[in-house]
């Protein structure tokens, strides 16, 4: 992987990730394909929304179908027939979200298989091996996603263990001869001094990109913005910056304003299945009765397949009848909305008009522009 940085506007960056499998224009949003599928979508449909890279889930693909089935096909690209780049998370977040059925040690994490209850163990080395078999174009280190709230002492211990696991991840990644990209993950909760230590330690180890982890886990938005404003300038400028698990459209806008290049989140697909659809002026809850006889498209400014062909009344009908097509059409629209938003942000950075774009974005939704505390 090669990262090219074209231009900046304030702290916002316009560039691209170059892989053997294709180019990803940044800032970029990655749809989430947890089980080797972006829910309800064919790879061709995902590509048609403008997505150039997707995310796969190491933890879930390890449990089902497993490494051996994956290797029978070649790798995850062959298994799911997605031709572009794939980023896989390390499995850390899923393991730590298991709560009482897992035990964290210095060696790794012992837990019960949520499918059948069998005891199972995952550590940095195993995570690197699974992601190698998946053929991931971007591999994520195995870390502990520090929960929120966490006091300073716990956050420090967690961050320090994640640094040790980062080194173990790097060593195993290299020993496998993996020629793809490996990203470090910055931890430290909402504490700036701990984030400083994490960034410094990861840069000393050396990675192809750096993710900001442990945010969007329940902390106030002001804390997320503050940490991004503090951390992003410390990440080497020639490396991509990835904000994990984020987020709402406004979170993408605020991340870009603070220097983030990459995002992922289940929100556009999950919300689509629940009838919450993102439009230029905010959010449409398509199951509400007021849409029953509305013959207008979901979003007159959207060029997606759904908006070009179907009315709000039809989408309302499908949702009320719990038809699978409704979830699919909603997903196509939400994914396209996110890709149109990212394209708009990229164009605004190119033209040096990002803050004008941001102001218009919030005006259309009837909300104030959040403060930006950067030099």
UniProtKB/Swiss-Prot annotation:
Record field: transmembrane: none
Enzymatic reactions: 7-aminomethyl-7-carbaguanine + guanosine(34) in tRNA = 7-aminomethyl-7-carbaguanosine(34) in tRNA + guanine
Sample GO molecular function, one term: metal ion binding
Binding site for Zn(2+): 302, 304, 307, 333
Record-linked Pfam families: TGT
This protein's GO CC annotations: cytosol
Pathway: tRNA modification; tRNA-queuosine biosynthesis
Family: Belongs to the queuine tRNA-ribosyltransferase family.
Protein name (database record): Queuine tRNA-ribosyltransferase
Taxonomic lineage: Bacteria, Pseudomonadati, Pseudomonadota, Gammaproteobacteria, Enterobacterales
Primary gene name: tgt
């Amino acid at each position: 992987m090669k990262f090219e940085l074209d231009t900046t506007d304030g702290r916002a960056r316009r560039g691209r990730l170059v892989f053997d499998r294709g180019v990803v224009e940044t800032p970029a949003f990655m749809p989430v394909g947890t089980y080797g599928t972006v829910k309800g979508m064919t790879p061709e449909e995902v590509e048609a929304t403008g997505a150039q890279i997707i995310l796969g889930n190491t933890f879930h693909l390890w449990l089902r179908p497993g490494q051996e089935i994956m290797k029978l096909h070649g790798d995850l690209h062959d298994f799911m027939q997605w031709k572009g780049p794939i980023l896989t998370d390390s499995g850390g977040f899923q393991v730590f979200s298991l709560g009482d059925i897992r035990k964290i040690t210095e060696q790794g994490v012992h837990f019960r298989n949520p499918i059948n209850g069998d005891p199972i163990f995952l550590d940095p080395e195993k995570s690197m091996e699974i992601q190698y078999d998946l053929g991931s174009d971007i591999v994520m280190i195995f870390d502990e996603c520090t929960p929120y709230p966490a006091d300073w002492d716990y956050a420090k211990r967690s961050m320090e263990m994640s640094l040790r696991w980062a080194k173990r991840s790097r060593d195993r990644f290299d020993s496998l001869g993996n020629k793809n990209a490996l990203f470090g993950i910055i931890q430290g909760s909402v504490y700036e001094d701990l984030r400083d230590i994490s960034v410094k330690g990861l840069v000393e180890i050396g990675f192809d990109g750096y993710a900001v982890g442990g945010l969007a886990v329940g902390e106030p938005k002001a804390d997320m913005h503050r940490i991004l404003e503090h951390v992003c300038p410390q990440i080497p400028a020639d490396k991509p910056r990835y904000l994990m698990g984020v987020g709402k459209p406004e979170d993408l806008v605020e991340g870009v304003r603070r220097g983030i290049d990459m995002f992922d989140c289940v929100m556009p697909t999950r919300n689509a299945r629940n009838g919450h659809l993102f439009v230029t002026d905010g959010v449409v809850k398509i199951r509400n009765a007021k849409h029953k006889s509305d013959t207008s498209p979901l979003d007159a400014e959207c060029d997606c397949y759904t908006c070009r062909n179907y009315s709000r009344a039809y989408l309302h009908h499908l949702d009320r009848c719990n038809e699978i097509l409704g979830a699919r059409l909603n997903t196509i629209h939400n994914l396209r909305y996110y890709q149109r938003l990212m394209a708009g942000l990229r164009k605004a950075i190119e033209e040096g008009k990002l803050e004008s774009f941001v102001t218009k974005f919030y005006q259309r939704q009837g909300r104030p522009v959040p403060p930006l505390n950067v030099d």
